[in-house]
Amino acid sequence: MDCSGYVRTVLLQHDMIIPRDASQQAVTGQRIEIAKDFSNLQPGDLVFFGRVADGKERVGHVAFYLGNKEFIHCLGLVERSSFDPTAPNYDAYNTGRMLFAARVLPYINKEKGLNTTDQNPYYQANFE
């Protein structure tokens, strides 16, 4: 399973539907520029990683923020990592390519592409 599939699966287990790819997930909810101390993030926020090319952000990875500078993500295996350089699970690679975060949970059923199954036309048509 890849990162965006992991995010999608976890949310679907809680009856929430989110777009399929990390780049699509990155344009949902409220964008958050991450504070140096991570104080403006909340557990459940999505953190996006990638690179800036030609002045444009290229999202290539997504994770759930857990709090206390930790995040959980998947690249084949689910892994709990940290942005804190003093932590044993510090992830220097992903810390170096962190772009921004997004708060999506308050926007479920309020924004196109973020639904619960009972509000999604596909699920209504095929599973009732």
Question: For the regions a protein language model found, what residue spans apply to each?
Answer:
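Acidic helix/loop microenvironments that form the catalytic cleft of cell-wall polysaccharide enzymes
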Residues: 1-5, 49, 65
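Catalytic cysteine-centered active-site loop
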Residues: 1-42
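Aromatic- and glycine-rich peptidoglycan recognition patches
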Residues: 34-35, 59-128
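Generic structural signal for buried aliphatic residues
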Residues: 44-47
